[in-house]
């Protein structure tokens, strides 16, 4: 609809056609009609207010006893969904933690395979004796980040040999101190 068509539509509401007669009431009639109009407007307003639906108080009101009863039923229903970790089969866990992978990377790209084994929760022993020092440092930095991300640990167990363990493997003792003591005793 165009702008002019809308204008014509609305102007028809407010304009009185020439054919209609308009009576101008006397002042006396206006004074008598004014209180009647006010009274009818007030009645209309009151009826409009009465027509607004009232909220049912009983629908929203609950006692604390009902609320507690609902919460206890809710917690009872949800307790069936809880699985305790003690019920996990110990054989599967021991098989995962009992496997150790040995790696001797030749290039930095071999580090991805080591990280994959760590993500699969397997301990890895990494021998960096056959790689240049710069690449060895990059590999250790990468593996340190991987071990940190999975919550594991990395330990030096020999010259350029590192043990990387995931969170399900615990290493007791330390070989590094013993190796350093042995090296100093040969001097």
Swiss-Prot record:
Keywords: Cell cycle, Cell division, Cytoplasm, Septation. GO terms for cellular component: cytoplasm. InterPro entries: Cell_div_SepF, Cell_div_SepF/SepF-rel, SepF-like_sf. One of its GO terms (biological process) is FtsZ-dependent cytokinesis. The keyword tRNA-binding does not apply. It is found in: Cytoplasm. Residues 38-63, 70-97 have a biased composition (Polar residues). Homodimer. Interacts with FtsZ. Belongs to the SepF family. HAMAP family: SepF. This is Cell division protein SepF. It comes from Staphylococcus aureus (strain MRSA252).
């Amino acid at each position: 609809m165009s702008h002019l068509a809308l204008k014509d539509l609305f102007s028809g509401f407010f304009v009185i056609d020439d054919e209609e007669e308009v009576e101008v009431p006397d002042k006396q009639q206006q004074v008598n009609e004014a209180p009647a109009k006010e009274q009818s407007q007030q009645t209309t307003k009151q009826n409009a207010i009465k027509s607004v639906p009232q909220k049912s108080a009983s629908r929203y009101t609950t006692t604390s006893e009902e609320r507690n009863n609902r919460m206890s039923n809710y917690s009872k229903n949800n307790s069936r969904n809880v699985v305790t970790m003690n019920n996990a089969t110990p054989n599967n866990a021991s098989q995962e933690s009992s496997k150790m992978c040995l790696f001797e990377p030749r290039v930095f790209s071999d580090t991805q395979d080591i990280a994959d084994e760590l993500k699969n929760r397997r301990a890895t022993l990494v021998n960096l004796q056959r790689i240049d020092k710069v690449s060895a440092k990059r590999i250790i930095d990468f593996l340190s980040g991987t071990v940190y991300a999975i919550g594991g640990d990395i330990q030096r167990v020999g010259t350029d040999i590192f043990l990387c363990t995931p969170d399900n493997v615990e290493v007791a003792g330390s070989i590094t101190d013993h190796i350093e003591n042995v090296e100093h005793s040969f001097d």
